[in-house]
Amino acid sequence: MNKSEKFFDRVSTKSKPEPNKTASKIIESSIEFLEKDKYVLDFGCGSGAITNKIAKEVKAIEAIDISSGMLGFAQKQAEENAITNIKYRQVSIFDEDLKNETFDVILAFNVLHYIEDMPNHVERINSLLKPNGIFISSTACMKEKRSLVRYLVSFLSKLGIVPKMNSYGKVELETLIENGNFEVIKSEKISKLPEYFIVMKKK
């Protein structure tokens, strides 16, 4: 078990079933790009607060995460709410069971700033999407604003208390994804952090 997995396992004990204000905004904005016949991959699904809410909008969801604690909480909430079209799995996005051109939509909420090898991950996301597939992400872009939160996160990360977080600017993040054979179709600020909701289409 690596440090990130241990951290999120600890955090999972404080998870709540209902999405917070920002997560609710993510759900609202995502629904525009979801349809009843779509097969979705939720990359870094966490506690399932978003996953379980959007399940009724799509055909099926494959939800993956590194944290067994988060997945356990998500699965329990799905069962309690009789949600049957989500498969929760503790695997990485590079798991060989995930086949190329399988998914209509891939979600990555509060995930990308933790990734060390972005180009490789973006390439993988692109390969898993069907032609013209949609990649929806929401990411804290800490370079956009000097704040106490930004410096505190950096300090805690250096101490190893929280996982390492990359500090992106909005345009920088969009360019990284675009370079993986995507085009931007929507980009909006959804929190004061600031966090950006970005929708990309596979070229």
Give the label of every model feature segment.
Residues N181, K186-K203:
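Core SAM-dependent methyltransferase catalytic element
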Residues P119-P131:
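A short glycine-rich, Lys/Arg-flanked "PGG" loop and its adjoining helix->strand segment in the class I
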Residues N110-V111:
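Short catalytic micro-motifs in class I SAM-dependent methyltransferases
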Residues M1-E35, K143, V153-L156, S191-L193:
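Conserved class I S-adenosyl-L-methionine
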Residues S138-G180, I185-E188:
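C-terminal alpha-helical "lid/dimerization" subdomain adjacent to the S-adenosyl-L-methionine
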Residues L107:
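A conserved beta-strand element that flanks and buttresses the S-adenosyl-L-methionine
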Residues Y39, G133-I134:
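Short glycine-centered segments of the SAM/dcSAM-binding site in methyltransferase folds
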Residues L41, S47-D95:
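Class I SAM-dependent methyltransferase SAM/SAH-binding core
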